[in-house]
Amino acid sequence: MAVGKNKRLTKGKKGQKKKIIDPFTKKDWYDVKAPSQFAVRNIGKTLVNRTSGTKIASDGLKGRVFEVSLADLQNGEIAFRKFRLIAEEVLGKSVLTNFHGMSMTSDKLKSLVKKWQTLIEAHIDAKTTDGYLLRFFAIGFTKKRPNQIKKTAYAKTSQCRSIRKKMTDIITREVSAIDLKEVVNRLIPDSIGKDIEKSCQSIYPLHDVYIRKVKVLKKPKLDTAKLLELHGEGVASSGDAGSAVRRDGYEPPVQESV
């Protein structure tokens, strides 16, 4: 008789279930922090695999983009404007973010388009003082002149061209003289759109003038010290509340429609 293992005795039971391991036991939660110019600093949490061997958790977090409504960032009612924030640095259990773009909700944009008026759009590339190249998309609509009887408010092609040039000049002039932090401060109340509306009154009356979208095309190398300054010298000292953004001499426009 051959000496060896009895294979039948070593076999396991058929249909035996595998041990189920919960994947969340290998993950950690991190707090996502918005820059200090927003009223609400703690905007949510994000999940990432724990540091294991050569795979570092912070590397998996950097570059993540979070889209947050302005109403959630400012405890306000303007929910149609959305800000994109990109994870730049990880400090302890906190993810420090920076501005990565802005857009308006599609339902708000569709509600602005009406009959008997002209839609005017412009897109402009402008560079900030700290090296960020941004692309701005502006939108505006013509409206009736005071005491106008005619129901239509159509602008001529030459007037549209002049308004478009005015949009380009105002955005380029304002953005090229300030840094990214100040650009965000002006996007929160959309004061650039109000400036365009006032400047174009002599060409043709406008209403519902907005910066509908902002893209970050190029950005300089990450400066950690500047990022910490943007977040109020570290998360531990800054807390969960930011500072209110105000602009002297600026009054927010009255919303004709929601």
From Swiss-Prot:
Organism: Trichoplax adhaerens
Oligomer status and interactors: Component of the small ribosomal subunit. Mature ribosomes consist of a small (40S) and a large (60S) subunit. The 40S subunit contains about 33 different proteins and 1 molecule of RNA (18S). The 60S subunit contains about 49 different proteins and 3 molecules of RNA (28S, 5.8S and 5S).
Domain of life: Eukaryota
Family, similarity comment: Belongs to the eukaryotic ribosomal protein eS1 family.
UniProt record, GO biological process: translation
Keyword Ribosomal protein applies: yes
Span list, region Disordered: 235-258
One Gene Ontology MF term: structural constituent of ribosome
Chief localization: cytoplasm
InterPro entries (alphabetical): Ribosomal_eS1, Ribosomal_eS1_CS, Ribosomal_eS1_euk
Compartment annotation: Cytoplasm
Keywords: Cytoplasm, Ribonucleoprotein, Ribosomal protein
Annotated Gene Ontology cellular component terms: cytosol; cytosolic small ribosomal subunit
Name of the protein: Small ribosomal subunit protein eS1
